[in-house]
Amino acid sequence: HYKELGISHVEGLVDSINQEKSEVNLHGGTTVGYDRLLVASGSTPVTPPIEGVDHPLVSSCWTLEDARRISEVAKPNTDVVLMGAGFIGCIILEALAKSGANLTVIEMEDRMVPRMMNDTAGNLIKDWCESRGVSVNTSTRVESITEVGGGLSVTLSDGKSIPADLVVSAT
């Protein structure tokens, strides 16, 4: 498909980009010319420095495999805590809300999607979530995650503890 559109896919480490010559200099000496350039550098999930975040019932949602593992646990009436209500967190939130799980969202900023939305828009999203039975906690941090019985207890910065069958990190 890409070849039909005249698009080349090149993987490698980039040493420099010469915009004047429309060239990318790759590590190892190869130079690749371009008409238009898209750099897709990829990324990796950030693991927050929270006690217990390495527990097997705590998952990031970064890959299709992660999403499948989460959907196996997030069933109706299970308790799920979602850490992070940014753009990606809200996409995950929607899927979790549809699962029928009892969903609690923890966002350390004062509103949902804080990097993209002002107070009004962030609060509209919060109201929408709460109207669908999602508990949203803003200006709150997860302090620790501990195993209790067969599940987890999530301790928050306001002193509350929330039971969880699964914690999803979208930080």
Model segments located where?
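FAD-binding core/adjacent interface of flavoenzyme oxidoreductases
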Residues: 2-81, 153-171
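A Rossmann-like FAD-binding core segment of flavoenzymes
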Residues: 9-17, 25, 32, 99-171
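ATP/adenylate-binding site constellation spanning eukaryotic-like Ser/Thr protein kinases
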Residues: 43, 55, 85, 118, ...
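A general structural signal for well-ordered alpha-helical segments in protein cores
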Residues: 47, 67, 89, 122-126
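Short glycine-/acidic-enriched loop or helix-start segments at secondary-structure transitions
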Residues: 48-50, 92-93, 115, 147
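Short beta->alpha linker loops
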Residues: 62-65, 87, 140
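Rossmann-like NAD(P)H-binding beta-loop-alpha module
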Residues: 69-117
